[in-house]
A protein has these predicted regions:
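C-terminal catalytic/motor cores of large multi-domain enzyme assemblies
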Residues: 1-4, 9-226
Length: 226
C-alpha cells in the first residue's frame, strides 16, 4: 500500500509541476435530471440489474462536449499537442484500501445511456475486485472524478497526465432559488450541483475552458433521454 500511494502522489506532484492548473466552477440546476432518475431507477434496475446513477448522464454530457470541443480531447507530448481520434473517458474509482484507480470507457461517445451505465458499473466492480485488465486502465483522453460521493460540494481536481483537463462532480443539494415567472419572482426549491473543470492553461485558455464547462452544464440542465 505504501508503494502504491507513493506512485500516485508522485504522479500528482508531477502534474502540478508540469501543467499550470486553472479551475473553473459552475453551479448547475439538475432538477430535471433528478426527477428523471427517480422516475426510471426502479424499472432500470429490474431491466439491467444495476443501479441507475447520475454518472452515465454526466459521462454522456462530457462525451458530447469533447466531440464539440476536440481541442480539449488532446494530450501533451513535450512541445507537441496530440489530437485524439477516440473519446476515452476515465472515471476515478475509490478502492476499499483508500487508494484510487481510473478505469477507462473506450469510445464513450458511441455508447447510449444504458451502455454507459453498464460499463461504469462493470469497471467499478472490476476495480474493487482487482480484476481490471491493462487495456481498461490505459488510453484515457479525459477524466471525471466524483467527490459528490463523499458529500463534497466542489473541489479543484488535479489533471491526470498527459491529459489536459479533468471534471470534478460535486454532491447534489436542495437549495432555495429565485425563479422568474409572469407574475413576478418566486422562491422555489431546486436541486443544485457544482461542476469544476481543471485544465492545463498551456493548451486550454479561459474561453475554451468556460465554453466546454458550460456545454456540459447546459446539457445536464436541459437533459432529456429522448
Amino acid at each position: 500500500r505504501q508503494r502504491q500511494m507513493c506512485i500516485r502522489d508522485s504522479h500528482m506532484v508531477m502534474s502540478k509541476k508540469v501543467s499550470p492548473h486553472v479551475t473553473n466552477v459552475v453551479e448547475v440546476d439538475v432538477t430535471r435530471l433528478v426527477h428523471w432518475r427517480e422516475k426510471n431507477k426502479d424499472a432500470f434496475f429490474r431491466r439491467e440489474g444495476v443501479k441507475l446513477t447520475y454518472m452515465p448522464v454526466i459521462t454522456e454530457a462530457v462525451a458530447k462536449a469533447l466531440a464539440a470541443y476536440p481541442q480539449v480531447n488532446v494530450s501533451v507530448d513535450g512541445y507537441n499537442i496530440l489530437f485524439k481520434k477516440h473519446i476515452n473517458i476515465g472515471i476515478a474509482v475509490s478502492l476499499n484500501d483508500g487508494n484510487l484507480i481510473v478505469p477507462v470507457i473506450h469510445d464513450a461517445d458511441r455508447l447510449n445511456l444504458n451502455g454507459l451505465a453498464l460499463s461504469i458499473n462493470s469497471l467499478a466492480l472490476k476495480a474493487r475486485n482487482n480484476k481490471l485488465t491493462p487495456d481498461e486502465i490505459s488510453g484515457g483522453t479525459f477524466t471525471i472524478t466524483n467527490y459528490g460521493t463523499f458529500k463534497m460540494l466542489f473541489g479543484t481536481p488535479v489533471i491526470n497526465q498527459p491529459e489536459v483537463a479533468i471534471l470534478g462532480v460535486g454532491s447534489i443539494e436542495k437549495k432555495p432559488v429565485v425563479k422568474e415567472t409572469p407574475e413576478g419572482d418566486v422562491i422555489a426549491i431546486r436541486h443544485k450541483m457544482y461542476l469544476s473543470l481543471s485544465y492545463d492553461h498551456r493548451v486550454v485558455d479561459g474561453s475554451l475552458g468556460g465554453n466546454f464547462l458550460h456545454f456540459i452544464a447546459d446539457y445536464l440542465e436541459r437533459f432529456t433521454s429522448e
